[in-house]
Design a protein with these regions (language model features):
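N-terminal secretory signal peptides that target proteins for export/translocation
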Residues: 1-11
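Short amphipathic alpha-helical segments with coiled-coil-like heptad repeat character
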Residues: 2, 111-117, 430, 510, ...
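A cross-taxon signal for low-complexity, glycine/charged-rich
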Residues: 13, 33-35, 604-605
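Bacterial N-terminal signal peptides
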Residues: 14-25
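Sec/Tat signal peptide C-region and signal peptidase I cleavage site
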Residues: 28-32
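Predominantly soluble domains enriched in secretory-pathway, periplasmic, or organellar proteins
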Residues: 34-455
């Protein structure tokens, strides 16, 4: 039986902590044997958040650090259960601080439901989330009772399903390159193999089915653009296919033509029955789903907060339906639509609501509160049905505690905890009076920050340090103050003296949250304050091992519309990026698409190159390997302009970004393009290594310090500095690079040296240092699966204070924006509550002295002492 949840109405003004135990991740132990060859060790060290590793790492770390079997954690279960149960409350609060109280009856489903279709008197729901090596789930729901009558297990699902004229249901098999035919008894009657990753599909007659391939592979195994194929369901053969561009997502068959949303190219492509392309229609950013009303199509543009209304008779856009009235460029994240009774219903994942529009005027009539991250809306009979991808219990108490289960995909991993839901409410309740009340409720659930309050602190320099995957309890549970649980601490004071000292000397932030569950979402939030609906889905697919690639922060279809560096450039605020690959790829593509056009040859070569890189994994050393020898030669736009005259360097840059010499040729002939690339290069430190566990964070510190001291001598320290310090990620229990404690101690020591160096520099008097993790996926925590360690230091930061105010990564972005004068990036950080509670108007200029590290490897200790002597 499903769990039926009836959340209480919002209790206004409450800021609460809903207890959740993120425990020790059960799963298969992936300790690499000592006699494995070095290639396996290096592969694991190079691969950033390998899907099959992440759930294992905490179990490995627990057994290695505690020196006892994983089952030893059982002694802590009783206390954890009591805390979790005692903290249950009716109101649900997201990591962002937004509050949930969805309308209607709530039915709990599987993980990340993204698609639903009425079929044979039931609602068939595709749960497309994190299911490790177990199959994903198709739930057969009786909407009136909310009962899940049957569950089908299909290994891989893309969020697309459609009923054919013959009465059967077709389901897209995603990364398994299959299509499934389900009969009216809800059994899989047949499966078909196709030649690419199956995406959107639509039957066109009793025999033929149009299927999109999200992407394909070439003979070298590289990912290439997608296709539109016609599948003969009687023979199982593909009759014909045609190129459909980068990441075609959904297909509709209207008036004898196929309409395909091309998510990666921001357009709708039109094909005739023979798959000859007969037109294209520009859309907004990241078009995904569509809904139809006769000859009109509504195309949902997820990243530009609008629906493109298409007149299929004329083949032209007939207007736009806008979903954002909040004064921010994007962020409501529309995900689906339905047309019924003179209205258009649109799910807004960024507002946790369904927007209701008058179909004729295209004006918004109001908002209906939904659960967390609504992804699908339907009107079926008398009911409005809404899928909520992340459910209605975002901060889930886990009363079973950290079970030492050996099952794959156990109940304690952060993505496993996310269970979706179905909201069911009478469509008649969506009246003018009901909408007015519901709209107020949705808006009342937002954080309450008023931007006019502002800051009046003389902070001119912000140093923004991002680390990897640690929860609060895992590091600071033994702090002795704040809300910590020392029984869950793996890297306590004996390993992380700097982090403990920072929490004690400045502020203890024990109520600070990551906005994404995993690193691909976390880095999107730390760099852009946003993660697109496609990224949310693809991230879950990658971490469950279904998608074997790493396009994140690289391939344009999975990047954000705007990043920190875009806002900084617009505000003419100087900045410097250390190690964050997202900058290298996203900024380069923006320049190419703005200067030459997204359909230009160079922009398309960039797309192909990043698709090729993504088929391997995220290679953090690709840029460093060719560029580090040029360190110091591109630190200003003028210097970088001269460097672009160096044929060898420009050839390396061209190969890095487009895979051949075509960019080098364009840079020589196009003065404006060369000028913009010179500015782009001058913002990135060539000799600061990105992801690579074989490279010490102490060496990253050394590269940063040399850069910083040169800037300080010249009086040219950038106002915003982004540093990625990744080695607290660890390599699990594989100790041939370092032990887990040594990795974390190395990271801790490097952080201490960074803070100390800034505090003894001329810019300390007007600086703020903010430190946070990208996510908490790899650590236990008794409060919440997304609670992370975070630190603040600077003359205007309070000393010796415990700050219990609720903050998140968006709070840090908003704080930096207010202090430095750059605009909010989107709705998320525009509504975020800044870090008001950390500040003191009276400066304390006392420098910070980092404590001596205690758990370094011999090599790191020697390097640390060398760096100390060199200061």
């Amino acid at each position: 039986m499903p769990t039926t949840l009836r959340p209480s109405p919002i209790s206004k003004g409450a800021l609460l902590v809903v207890a959740l135990l993120l425990s020790l991740f059960p799963a298969r132990v992936a300790v690499v044997a000592q006699d494995d060859d070095d290639a396996q060790r290096v592969e694991r060290a190079d691969n950033f958040d390998r899907a099959e590793d992440e759930e294992d790492l905490n179990r490995e770390l627990w057994e290695y650090v505690k020196g006892t079997p994983y089952a030893g954690v059982l002694s802590y279960v009783a206390a954890a259960q009591a805390r979790a149960e005692g903290a249950r409350v009716a109101e649900a609060v997201l990591p962002t601080g937004w509050k949930l109280a969805p309308a209607g009856r709530q039915v709990e489903l599987g993980r990340l439901p993204y698609e639903a279709v009425p079929f044979a008197g039931r609602l068939v729901v595709l749960n497309t989330g994190y299911y490790t090596r177990e199959p994903q789930e198709v739930s057969v729901v009786e909407p009136a009772s909310g009962r899940v009558e049957k569950t089908l297990r299909i290994n891989s699902l893309f969020p697309s399903a459609s009923v054919g004229p013959g009465g059967d249901l077709y389901i897209s098999g995603g990364f398994d390159s299959k299509v499934y035919r389900v009969n009216r008894e809800f059994n899989v009657a047949h499966e078909y193999a196709v030649a690419g990753f199956a995406a959107g599909l639509v039957p066109i007659d009793e025999r033929r089915l149009a299927v999109l391939y999200l992407a394909g592979k070439d003979e070298k195994g590289n990912y290439v653009s997608g296709r539109l194929a016609l599948l003969d369901t009687e023979t199982g053969r593909v009759e014909r296919d045609a190129d459909a561009g980068y990441f075609p997502y959904a297909v509709r068959f209207v008036g004898g033509k196929f309409y395909v949303t091309v998510l990666g190219e921001n357009r709708l492509r039109v094909f005739d029955r023979e798959l000859k392309e007969v037109g294209e229609i520009p859309t907004g950013r990241r078009p995904q789903e569509m809904c139809a009303d006769g000859a009109r199509l509504y195309v949902v543009n997820t990243d530009s907060d609008e629906l493109t209304v298409v007149d299929t008779a004329s083949g032209r856009a007939a207007g736009v339906l806008r979903t954002n009235s909040f004064g921010s460029p994007f962020g409501t994240a529309p995900t689906s639509c339905a047309v019924a009774g003179g209205r258009v219903y649109v799910t807004l994942a960024g507002l946790n609501a369904v927007a209701v529009y008058d179909k004729r005027t295209r004006q918004q009539a109001g908002l209906v509160p939904a659960g967390w991250y609504p992804t699908k809306v339907l009107v079926e009979g008398d009911n409005l049905l809404v899928l909520n991808a992340k459910g209605v219990r975002p901060r889930r108490p886990n009363p079973r505690g950290p079970q030492p289960s050996t099952s794959v995909g156990g109940p304690d991993y952060v993505l496993t905890l996310l269970k979706g839901s179905l909201s069911v409410l009478p469509v008649g309740d969506v009246s003018a009076r009901g909408l007015a009340s519901w709209t107020r409720q949705v808006l009342a659930g937002a954080p309450t920050f008023d931007a006019r309050r502002g800051f009046k602190l003389p902070v001119k320099h912000v140093f923004y340090v991002v680390k990897e995957n640690r929860s609060y309890d895992q590091v600071l549970g033994d702090l002795g103050r704040g809300d910590g649980d020392k029984s869950l601490t793996l890297f306590g004071r004996d390993v992380t003296p700097t982090q403990h000292a920072l929490a004690e000397a400045f502020v203890t932030l024990d109520n600070f949250y990551a906005d994404g569950e995993i690193s691909v979402l976390g880095h999107s939030f730390t760099t852009s304050g946003y993660a697109s609906p496609f990224l949310e889905w693809l991230g879950n697919a990658a971490y469950s091992g279904r998608y074997r690639g790493y396009p994140f922060g690289m391939v344009p279809s999975v990047t954000s519309p705007a990043y920190l560096w875009d806002a900084l450039d617009d505000a003419k605020v100087s900045y410097r990026i250390y190690g964050e690959n997202y900058y290298l790829y996203t900024r380069a593509y923006r320049i190419l698409s703005e200067e030459l056009g997204a359909q230009s040859e160079l922009a398309r070569r960039f797309y192909a190159r990043t698709m090729s890189l993504a088929s391997e994994t995220d290679r953090g050393r690709v840029f460093y390997d060719f560029a580090h020898t040029y360190a110091g030669r591109g630190d200003t736009p003028a210097d970088a302009g001269r460097l672009l005259a160096d044929e060898k360097f420009t050839a390396g840059l061209s190969n890095f970004l487009v895979g051949d010499g075509s960019l080098a040729a364009a840079l020589q002939s196009n003065v404006r393009l060369r000028r913009r690339f010179a500015e782009y290069l001058s913002r990135y430190a060539f000799d600061y290594r990105s992801w690579d566990l074989t490279h010490s964070d102490l060496d990253r510190f050394a590269a940063w310090r040399a850069d910083f001291e040169r800037q300080a001598r010249a009086g040219a320290v950038p106002r915003f500095n982004y540093l990625w310090l990744p080695n607290d990620h660890t390599n699990g229990a594989d100790t041939r690079i370092r032990t887990p404690q040594q990795f974390v101690a190395q990271n801790d020591a490097a952080l201490g040296l960074i803070v100390e160096t800034i505090s003894r520099s001329p810019v300390w008097r007007d600086s703020l240092i903010l430190v946070e993790e990208d996510d908490a996926q790899n650590g236990p925590d008794h409060v919440d699966a997304t609670r992370i360690v975070a630190f603040a230091a600077g003359p205007y930061v309070r000393r010796g204070a415990v700050v219990n105010d609720r903050y998140d990564q968006l709070s840090a972005l908003r704080t930096a924006g207010l202090l430095l004068g750059f605009r909010p990036l989107n709705l998320n950080d525009r509504m975020a509550v800044p870090l008001f509670g950390i500040f003191d108007a009276r400066p304390n200029l006392t420098p910070y002295t980092a404590p001596a590290p205690t758990a370094l490897s011999d090599a790191d200790r020697a390097r640390y002492e060398e760096l100390r002597r060199a200061k």
